[in-house]
Amino acid sequence: MYPEDLPREAEVYRIARRLGGRITVSDLIVEIGVSAQIAEQSLERLVDGTRVGIEVSDNGVIVYEFREFTGR
């Protein structure tokens, strides 16, 4: 997997903003039509603990929280 295979960072941020700041791998798959592996890698590379964090929902789904877009 090469970086050019991954969606652009700005594209992922736009999707996160539109979806209220909380997205899952499945959200990214549906929105841009990539594989689960590419979607997961795209989100994982953005996790920095400040702007983007990870949370596990009550049903065990990993949710990526784009903190600048939540609670607006």
Model regions and ranges:
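Long, charge-rich, low-complexity intrinsically disordered regions
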Residues: 1-72
